Amino acid sequence: MVDVLAHESELLGLVKEYLDFAEFEDTLKTFLKECKIKGKPLSKSTCGSLRDPKSLKFQRDLLAAFDSGDQKVFFRLWEEHIPRPIRDGDSLAQKLEFYLHIHFAIYLLKHSAGRPDKEDLDERISYFKTFLETKGAALSQTTEFLPFYALPFVPNPMAHPSFKELFQDSWTSELKLKLEKFLALMFKASNTPKLLTLYKENGQSNKDVLQQLHQQLVEAERRSMTYLKRYNRIQADYHNLIGVTAELVDSLEATVSGKMITPEYLQSVCVRLFSNQMRQSLAHSVDFTRPGTASTMLRASLAPVKLKDVPLLPSLDYEKLKKDLILGSDRLKAFLLQALRWRLTTSHPGEQRETVLQAYISNDLLDCHSHSQRSVLQLLQSKSEVVRQYTARLINAFASLAEGRRYLAQSTKVLRMLEERLKEEDKDVITRENVLGALQKFSLRRPLQTAMIQDGLIFWLIDILKEPDCLSDYTLEYSVALLMNLCLRSAGKNMCAKVAGLVLKVLSDLLGHENHEIQPYVNGALYSILSIPSIREEARAMGMEDILRCFIKEGNAEMIRQIEFIIKQLNAEELLDGVLESDDDEDEDDEEDHDTMEADLDKDELIQPQLGELSGEKLLTTEYLGIMTNTGKARRRGTAGVQWGGPEPLRRPVTPGGHRTGYPA
């Protein structure tokens, strides 16, 4: 009761202000009469809270700082009195603030009688630069403001025709008028009764807290997925290291007979390569000096260690899933496509992931075998940018797995739709990256290589590779790798022969590109197409050997050896051994057995769930839980032997993810 009495006058003033605002005239008269009878004083300070002398003083001070060019005072007042939601979210406020920064940046140039103080001018220009690089960056794609991003770098902006208008008195007057109108509009809009403001702010505050907590939960789940994938990648790197070490040990064994190293040293190296638990027993029980023993033991150590059992993921109602993927809202489709992709990308390699993939395939999740006019695959042509992107991501995830590629390759319509999307997608970089990634992985299969060559994909690749600096690293790497895979085929080489000069120029330019990840694919493509006499002749005419020798001077040892092979191919009058082998049959010899689930599949997610929305595995198991129908383990082929050791250019199809981790194709 004491608290009520202490604030009674202010509370009654709030009620009066609201009744007046809502035009409860009779109620207000009765209320005022009763307050007077009871002797209750009304606070007068609540009414017109933003029309008080303080707000008027702020406006006067702000306009005075504008006139005097005092940018520090101006922007301090601006940030103190203009609410952040308006500064950051209102387009009118953002544009006005941009022009205000220009006003203060050029103030000394306009108002100095003589030469402006250089230190003060440099400080203002630096302040404007900082604004452009931070808050002002949001308007960098707007045509209206684009020329002003060059302003800090023009030596004499007063003489530059693009900025002539800025130095006219009318420009400053118009800007000041806009500022005055903005302040008048803002303070007029702020005459909302304080009671209503308090109510709205309290509700919004609670909502903001809940939204923030929900966002933190989503981020925590995302980090968890990232760490899981990082663990899987480290495990793959470890296996790769052991495989490489086995080759090293074979080389060391070959030198033992030459007494270059001692058997004791070889044994100590081998023991160190094994896990801690095995070192002591192996050191005494295995004779590593017997040829073949060490490398055999190392390869045997690659057998997967039995970890704790990983449970299979719950089965899903695929009929309901596919129905909602076709008929649901675009937002629901996007969340479902995301959740289905995450099932693949975050599942444990082995039985859990194989079971997920087999369930997708056996239920024809993508409708590869459907002849219906409406299918899941057609989401690749959706009007929604998010749905198109998330469909492309899911297809790329399928293509990252050998069984997934086999499933997608059964229908030529998948390839045709991807090719069409690749050539048409110009709005979304990530959609095109994922479509390109899927096609590149398709090129590991010979029938799909043939189809892509016949469809003229080589010409499209050459065209975009003419300007490699305009491409993302992913697009560049996968484009060059796809081009190389297609150039390994006779039909692909003959396609290149039709535009030999252009192909050779593009590849020679790429040799010097700063992205060194593409070098093996550029070398492989060059080596392959130079087996065609007409291309060799064109290469000699353009001085290709001199170009290649320039890169020998600055390349690493591995690249130097590859370029030497290319030069040898260039100067050959007859084809080198092995180049004439036939590649006309459509067998699957080029298909690789390993699975490469790259981290890029889940980068830069476009959608985040709002408060109360389900996403990911929670969405699938809450709304689409099915009966337990998990299929058995997929048939797995053994890991292929290493096909490429470095000295020669690549001569078998690869995919960038698999090539980097050391897996062969």
From Swiss-Prot:
GO biological process, one term: positive regulation of smoothened signaling pathway
Organism classification: Eukaryota, Metazoa, Chordata, Craniata, Vertebrata
Modified residues (Phosphoserine): S582
UniProt keyword list: Cell projection, Cilium biogenesis/degradation, Coiled coil, Cytoplasm, Cytoskeleton, Phosphoprotein
Primary role: Involved in ciliogenesis. It is required for appropriate acetylation and polyglutamylation of ciliary microtubules, and regulation of cilium length. Acts as a positive regulator of hedgehog (Hh)signaling. May participate in the trafficking and/or retention of GLI2 and GLI3 proteins at the ciliary tip.
Known partners and oligomeric status: Interacts with TOGARAM1, CCDC66, CEP104, CSPP1 and CEP290. Interacts with NDUFAF2.
Stored InterPro entries: ARM-like, ARM-type_fold, ARMC9, ARMC9_ARM_dom, ARMC9_CTLH-like_dom, ARMC9_LisH, LisH
Name of the protein this chain belongs to: LisH domain-containing protein ARMC9
Coiled coil regions in record: 204-235
Pfam families: ARMC9_ARM, ARMC9_LisH, CTLH_Armc9
Gene Ontology cellular component terms for the protein in this record: centriole; ciliary basal body; ciliary tip; cilium; cytoplasm
Biased composition (Acidic residues): 582-603
Keyword Phosphoprotein part of the UniProt annotation: yes
